[in-house]
Swiss-Prot record:
The gene is porD. Heterotetramer of one alpha, one beta, one delta and one gamma chain. Residues 25-54, 51-80 form the 4Fe-4S ferredoxin-type domain. PROSITE patterns: 4FE4S_FER_1, 4FE4S_FER_2. Optimum pH is 10.0. [4Fe-4S] cluster 1 binds at residues 34, 37, 40, 70. Pfam families: Fer4_21 (PF14697). It comes from Methanothermobacter marburgensis (strain ATCC BAA-927 / DSM 2133 / JCM 14651 / NBRC 100331 / OCM 82 / Marburg) (Methanobacterium thermoautotrophicum). This is Pyruvate synthase subunit PorD.
């Protein structure tokens, strides 16, 4: 099997189009429980969580990876209203 290298010159369509409008579940962070491990930032596939642990809901797809990776369960997924 051969390897193929590539460079992404432009972000995918997520940055061009707000995708948060069709989300079913929404992450909520309890900052009192947060231990600043930054797992949520590291594992978010859309890069929707900033250094202050604010979530950009315009682009969050509600996948729940941030909640799954949080070691202290400071992020809860709630049904979108």
């Amino acid at each position: 099997m051969e390897s193929l290298g590539a460079t992404v010159k432009e972000p995918g369509s997520t940055r061009k189009n707000k995708t948060g409008s069709w989300r079913t579940f929404k992450p909520f962070l309890d900052k009192d429980k947060c231990i600043d491990c930054d797992n949520c930032i590291l594992f978010c596939p859309e890069g929707c969580i900033d250094k202050e642990h604010e979530i950009d809901y315009d682009y969050c797809k509600g996948c729940g990876i941030c909640a799954e990776e949080c070691p202290v369960k400071a992020i809860k997924m709630e049904r979108e209203k």
